[in-house]
Amino acid sequence: MGKTPVEAKKILHDRPHVDCPIKDLISRIGDKWSMMVLMALDNAADNVMRFSELMRAINGISQRMLATTLRYLERDGIITRRVYPEVPPRVEYTLTKRGQDLLVPVKNLVGWISNEWPEIEKSRDAYDRQSDSKSN
């Protein structure tokens, strides 16, 4: 079971900021490319994709950035990398149980963003107009 809000607040308060696992994982998982990899694997048949399939599925990512992102996600146990002894080599990436569990809050966040985005844009526009009028 997850932490209660009081327990979560205590963890945030008691931990030194430099050693905070929450900050560490959020910065890793919350980056643009990790989210895109997770969503691509979630949309794939059996949650399995090859490197080249991920490259095609994630618009704008470079080979180097994809390789780096996959390495970090594998290191954290969010995906697995399976190499088949074939010529040419075949490598497949899949979500682990941890990765599938992570998708629950990720999908909730994506849904929240989808619902709130029009209002967020309005808030930004109003703020920018107000800031512009103050600077004139």
Model regions: which residues?
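Amphipathic alpha-helical dimerization/coiled-coil segments
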Residues: 2-7, 19, 103-136
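Short, Lys/Arg-enriched N-terminal segment that forms or immediately precedes the first helix
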Residues: 5-26
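N-terminal helix-turn-helix DNA-binding core of bacterial DNA-binding proteins
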Residues: 20-65
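Generic detection of well-ordered alpha-helical segments
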Residues: 27, 31, 35, 100, ...
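Short, hydrophobic secondary-structure boundary micro-motifs
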Residues: 37, 50, 82, 120-122
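Canonical helix-turn-helix DNA-binding module
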Residues: 51-84, 88
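Basic, amphipathic "hinge/linker" alpha-helix immediately C-terminal to the N-terminal HTH DNA-binding motif
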Residues: 86-108
